[in-house]
């Protein structure tokens, strides 16, 4: 499937196996498959994880940021593979 950029969650879900509540990409702004990617995550301040990290001083946990980076990298690699249909591991 040829994806044009920017693209949203429907196109992202066509490439990645991740789904809510653990899909941490909102859009891919730019991607040269196998080379580089620019992706974004819209952070909802109502996410339940902010209730405990940290109360009254919400911070997006670093592990979530790392997962978003891994998902973006996976998208870039898997998009380069085209219809091969393999799941990538970092």
Where are these regions (language model features)?
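Compact, glycine-rich, soluble single-domain proteins
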Residues: 51-61, 65-75, 90
């Amino acid at each position: 499937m040829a994806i044009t950029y920017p693209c949203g969650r429907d196109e992202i879900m066509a490439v990645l196996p991740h789904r809510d509540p653990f899909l941490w990409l909102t859009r891919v702004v730019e991607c040269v498959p196998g080379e580089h990617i620019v992706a974004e995550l819209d952070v909802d301040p109502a996410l339940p994880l902010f209730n405990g990290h940290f109360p009254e001083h919400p911070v997006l946990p670093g592990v979530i940021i790392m997962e978003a980076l891994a998902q973006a990298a996976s998208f870039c690699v898997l998009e380069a593979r085209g219809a091969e249909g393999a799941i990538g591991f970092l």
